Curated annotation (Swiss-Prot):
Molecular function via GO: 3-dehydroquinate dehydratase activity
Origin organism lineage: Bacteria, Bacillati, Bacillota, Bacilli, Bacillales
Highest taxon, organism lineage: Bacteria
Record-given protein name: 3-dehydroquinate dehydratase
Family: Belongs to the type-II 3-dehydroquinase family.
Listed InterPro entries: DHquinase_II, DHquinase_II_CS, DHquinase_II_sf
Enzyme Commission (EC) number: 4.2.1.10
GO terms of biological process kind: amino acid biosynthetic process; aromatic amino acid family biosynthetic process; chorismate biosynthetic process; quinate catabolic process
Source organism of the structure: Bacillus anthracis
Chain positions of site Transition state stabilizer: 18
HAMAP family (UniProt xref): AroQ
Residues passing through the membrane, by range: none
Length: 146
């Protein structure tokens, strides 16, 4: 059974109460439960991790290479400025799919650039929670191609 790590970055623990007009009413717990169910149906073991701390996210990315076949990552606001997370992604050999609930290109101008996307296998934005499922499908396809 393939193993995948789902990493959610800062403030995503506030889903369901934070800017519901942008992120919707669904909670992180709901998202994680739905993703685990989807993964199980695909024969994939999914582990979920959320942190508001850059170093903790970097540590999980580093550790993932020896445990998982791939990562689905929503770096949150770190997307736009964390060269440290970018370098952590670049340092591992497993594919990473970047996902965002909202379309970062339709939001404030400071959100338009992703410093992490260039070292990811792909990026999915703007499809709400469904984007995470798309990321899982894309990651499984990427692994089949390898």
């Amino acid at each position: 059974m393939k193993k995948v790590l789902l990493v959610n970055g800062p403030n995503l623990n506030r889903l369901g109460v934070r800017e519901v007009n942008v992120y919707g009413k669904g909670t992180l717990a709901t998202l994680e439960a739905d993703m685990k169910q989807e993964a199980e149906a695909m024969g994939v073991e999914l582990e979920c991790f959320q942190s508001n701390h850059e170093g903790a996210i970097i540590d999980r990315i580093h550790e993932a290479e020896d445990i998982y076949e791939g990562i689905i990552l929503n770096p949150g606001a770190f997307t736009h400025y964390s060269y440290a997370i970018r370098d952590a992604i670049a340092s591992i050999s497993i594919p990473v799919i970047e996902v965002h609930i909202s379309n970062i290109h339709q939001r404030e101008s400071f959100r338009h650039e992703s410093v992490t996307a260039a070292v990811c296998a792909g990026q999915i934005v703007g499809f709400g929670f469904y984007g995470y499922k798309l990321a899982l499908f894309a990651l499984m396809e990427k692994l089949r191609e390898a």
